[in-house]
């Protein structure tokens, strides 16, 4: 057999390298998104007043994309319904997120609400996007879900603390539902746009309205004073949030929605670490092991793609 038949040609090598680069791009985007989304939620939780902090983040995200609005393509008329669906789903997610962060530790509720999201996304994507997981991806998803359950188990608190944890867990589960819903809705909308940046801009321009209305009603005459205490964290969290979800939306156009969501959920490790370091929240060896298993399950999902 000739050597040319054994060794790959230069064209084959370049093609394989190109395919590897294409497959790595969504991974890199999602991991960057994971770090920034964990930091965003830390700023929201650190602000104390979670509702006002989330409002500040949403407003900054809207303002950050405003300069780009004149330069992105106008959404086609048939896509406006998709944009509005995404906005409403994001409002639902934000409300549940605020309640979850208000009730529980960042290192507890964040892994649950983010880690279960791939399961919701995978189920919804079957019906909405006609996307199916492979056997290996399904195994990784189940492994990750089991790790999350272990991560979220109580750590011997008093009866009152356990009650608060159960309440936080319910809101975290609803937030996971919201994450899965917006992942599928945003994937469908972003793919229908002439450019992903169009969807990023219009989503963030409209997204801040819901949480702002709720915050103004809840805080009434104290909203100005509350915002004065939150603007620093809101500025940092808002800029990070824009980067985080902007990267995710671009990744949605490159690969399956469930894969993107799963890769972003490696943020649970970053969130737990940030909660322990900056917010003085408990962590422990069990959560360290569970977080490692969770990451392994999510990586297994990517390996099966």
Predicted regions mapped to residue ranges:
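Hydrophobic/small/kink-forming positions within alpha-helical transmembrane segments
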Residues: 34-38, 91-92, 115-123, 180, ...
